[in-house]
């Protein structure tokens, strides 16, 4: 009995109707394979890639994706302690002044919480070290990925190297973070470092000290705190949105007006629903940031900023601190 015909089907036998199920894919930049730094896309992609060969053995070496995993984990978990600090600071510098409508009354609540977040050891543990780790891990992670892109895809000309380097690939979330670094540094300089240099500590620094600074230079401090609070709140809210999977401030752009000729037939049936969901998330996240920044500024500028000048020896001490501030002391 002749054996059955086991040859492959001819071209004419192929069900041409299956071609309808093919999807039209838009071209995307090669750098998107690595995901965004802020939302840790690359962690999941690297972990989903199976190991070469038949055996799956634990890798203890510091390979590329392991570097990404560790750096992304540091960048993510280093945001937890500062979030607790900023929540407490938000209550002390905005909510409580808004409720008491008085700087001296709000100062009493600040004194109650001072041992929790202003002691040298605890403050560095929940604020200084995590923020430094967060910024450093982000810088190292971007350099690792930019060098990998240059190695994999080539960067021979100056324009090619520029397109694969550190700065052009930054998302809005990352740009807000790097804008926040000098703003936060100035805040630490005026409220921590200078009092430590002049008085040996910041025990005399409180809401009255900040209100005294507003009287000395109202234009500078109003503009500074307006930018500082807006950038800080947007970065924190946008960062937590990214951790939760709500990508609002990433570099990827949805293609709304660039629909292909076969869209709606080749796998794009849910595109409109996805875009509506993205717009809804955008409004929610940015709405939370607007409300948070507005409340914080209402307490900081509306109550503390109008608290008035200090009196007696305390005002003289504060004047000496502001006069000793380096670089920006002439504006204060």
Where are these regions (language model features)?
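Membrane-embedded alpha-helical bundles that constitute the cytochrome b-like, heme-associated redox core
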Residues: 1-332
């Amino acid at each position: 009995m002749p054996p059955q015909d086991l040859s492959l089907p001819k071209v004419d036998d192929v069900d041409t109707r299956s071609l309808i199920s093919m999807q039209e894919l838009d071209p995307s930049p090669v750098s998107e394979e690595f995901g965004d730094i802020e939302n840790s896309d690359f962690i999941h992609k690297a972990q989903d890639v199976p190991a070469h060969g038949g055996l799956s053995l634990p890798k203890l070496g510091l390979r590329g994706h392991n570097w990404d995993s560790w750096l992304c984990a540091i960048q993510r978990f280093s945001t937890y302690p500062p979030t607790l600090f900023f929540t407490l600071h938000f209550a002390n510098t905005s909510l409580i002044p808004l409720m008491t409508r008085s700087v001296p009354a709000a100062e009493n609540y600040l004194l109650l919480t001072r041992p929790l977040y202003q002691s040298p050891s605890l403050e560095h543990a929940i604020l200084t070290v995590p923020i430094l780790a967060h910024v450093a891990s982000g810088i190292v992670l971007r350099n690792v990925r930019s060098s990998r892109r240059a190695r994999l895809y080539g960067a021979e000309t100056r324009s090619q190297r520029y397109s694969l380097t550190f700065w052009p690939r930054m998302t809005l979330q990352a740009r807000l973070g790097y804008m926040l670094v000098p703003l936060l540094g100035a805040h630490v300089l005026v409220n921590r470092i200078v009092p430590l240099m002049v008085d040996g500590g910041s025990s005399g620094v409180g809401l009255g000290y900040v209100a005294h600074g507003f009287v000395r230079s109202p234009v500078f401090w109003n503009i500074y705190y307006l930018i500082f609070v807006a950038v800080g709140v947007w970065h924190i809210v946008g960062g937590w949105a990214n951790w939760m999977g709500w990508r609002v401030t990433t570099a990827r752009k949805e293609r709304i007006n660039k629909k292909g000729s076969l869209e709606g037939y080749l796998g794009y049936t849910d595109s409109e629903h996805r875009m509506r969901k993205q717009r809804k998330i955008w409004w929610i996240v940015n709405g939370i940031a607007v409300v948070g920044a507005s409340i914080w500024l209402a307490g900081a500028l509306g109550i503390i900023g109008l608290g008035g000048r200090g009196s007696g020896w305390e005002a003289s001490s504060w004047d000496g601190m502001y006069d000793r501030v380096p670089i920006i002391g002439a504006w204060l």
